[in-house]
């Protein structure tokens, strides 16, 4: 559900298609065996339903699936990525994602537990000069329509660690949000 916060932010950069049902959200298909399809039947469909019902957004009700290296990636203002394991991007895929994010796209990565040691090196391949930075609870990303004054809610109860939100920021804009734990 936290994804709608990021969706709202990313859609602020799109044109007037939001109210016409033309904006479609996508699930990122990646290589490496990290089950990119985890929660495929629920994550984005539930987000779309919530945004259309609660935020009156009129998003396209069908999620898309887009490969990291595809030029189709530029058709989607919001891309969701999840999984439990290995993530690999070729040089071409990393370049495509870098261009997408620098051009106004937004990537939300949800650690479905076990993704952390793989997604961090994959992000370094996309942005070798950028680090994931923990976003403090007073960051604007937690102060949207439904504020999270105490930061991320705990979703997975695997190891008792507190949830954390990390971002990659370019020119003051969060282009990637990584919800960990």
Region annotations inferred by a language model:
Residues 1-10:
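Bacterial N-terminal signal peptides
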Residues 13-78, 82-85:
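Aromatic-Pro/Gly-enriched surface loop or interdomain linker
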Residues 16-21, 71-75, 101-102, 161, ...:
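Extracellular/periplasmic catalytic domains that process cell-envelope and extracellular macromolecules
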Residues 25, 78-117:
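Short alpha-beta junction capping motif
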Residues 32-33, 116-181:
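An acidic, glycine-rich "communication" segment
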Residues 42-46, 50, 92, 96, ...:
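Extracytoplasmic/secreted proteins, especially bacterial periplasmic and envelope-associated proteins
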Residues 47-58, 82, 99-103, 122-130:
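Structured segments of extracytoplasmic/periplasmic soluble domains
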Residues 57-67, 109-112, 130-137:
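Surface-exposed patches in mature extracellular/periplasmic domains of secreted proteins
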